[in-house]
Amino acid sequence: MHDAQIRVAIAGAGGRMGRQLIQAALQMEGVALGAALEREGSSLVGSDAGELAGAGKAGVAVQSSLAAVKDDFDVLIDFTRPEGTLNHLAFCREHGKGMVIGTTGFDDAGKQAIRDAAQDIAIVFAANFSVGVNVLLKLLEKAAKVMGDYTDIEIIEAHHRHKVDAPSGTALAMGEAIAGALNKDLKDCAVYSREGYTGERVPGTIGFATVRAGDIVGEHTAMFADIGERIEITHKASSRMTFANGAVRSALWLKGKKNGLFDMRDVLDLNSL
């Protein structure tokens, strides 16, 4: 392994996202796959991570604990579940390891734990690691500043049947981008469900609608609707590799950073636009 490479560990290696993260880590220049993890008791423990991901033998055996691979990685990439990610966060904070967190569904306490840990380690925490989605978020900020005060804003998202949280983290990030551009707190203006007799739409709110069906990788639309016209800004993902490549790119970007909380807009330098 070349000293210039950054070594990544992949949590949830046997999952759909984990396998593609392994592929991305093996393919990206400047990155080395240092470790792969699965839950204790998994039948995948001991298998070769590259073969598990369909990328050929990598010489990295899947392990069941971070302690077993403590000296084998610099940055952990975690797209698992909130409770597991927070356990990994505590370990990485204690041992000075960077993290790329793509897990969604954190409550306020979980988000605060991430902010606290970033005082000691470098973390990229994002709801979505695709370049396209992060450009979308920037476009939404611009659109909201121009027409957000007088249009009806709705966010519609669709994902595969196995997704366990709703609305998606990306949909919430879209809402936060719009609300922030309007100097609002999303908690004060979001409407997450409508059923029965709801009365007329409340001005200034941001509505959310969720679809869960089939194998949809991820589709997100923000609608700014006025009388006589509307603008729709949409992103559609057709492969999880776009997220995997973005996450591994983020791990590479963390090289040399000691601490701090960042997102994909930092990685892509979109905040300067």
UniProtKB/Swiss-Prot annotation:
It comes from Klebsiella pneumoniae subsp. pneumoniae (strain ATCC 700721 / MGH 78578). Catalyzes the conversion of 4-hydroxy-tetrahydrodipicolinate (HTPA) to tetrahydrodipicolinate. GO terms for molecular function: 4-hydroxy-tetrahydrodipicolinate reductase; NAD binding; NADP binding; oxidoreductase activity, acting on CH or CH2 groups, NAD or NADP as acceptor. Pathway: Amino-acid biosynthesis; L-lysine biosynthesis via DAP pathway; (S)-tetrahydrodipicolinate from L-aspartate: step 4/4. Pfam families: DapB_C, DapB_N. Belongs to the DapB family. Keywords: Amino-acid biosynthesis, Cytoplasm, Diaminopimelate biosynthesis, Lysine biosynthesis, NAD, NADP, Oxidoreductase. SUPFAM superfamilies: Glyceraldehyde-3-phosphate dehydrogenase-like, C-terminal domain (SSF55347), NAD(P)-binding Rossmann-fold domains (SSF51735). The keyword Amino-acid biosynthesis applies. NCBIfam families: dapB (TIGR00036). NADP(+) binds at residue 39. This is 4-hydroxy-tetrahydrodipicolinate reductase. (S)-2,3,4,5-tetrahydrodipicolinate binds at residues 160, 169-170. InterPro entries: DapB_C (IPR022663), DapB_N (IPR000846), DapB_N_CS (IPR022664), DHDPR_bac (IPR023940), NAD(P)-bd_dom_sf (IPR036291). Homotetramer. PROSITE patterns: DAPB. It catalyses: (S)-2,3,4,5-tetrahydrodipicolinate + NAD(+) + H2O = (2S,4S)-4-hydroxy-2,3,4,5-tetrahydrodipicolinate + NADH + H(+); (S)-2,3,4,5-tetrahydrodipicolinate + NADP(+) + H2O = (2S,4S)-4-hydroxy-2,3,4,5-tetrahydrodipicolinate + NADPH + H(+). GO terms for cellular component: cytosol. Its EC number is 1.17.1.8. NAD(+) binds at residues 12-17, 38, 102-104, 126-129. It is found in: Cytoplasm.
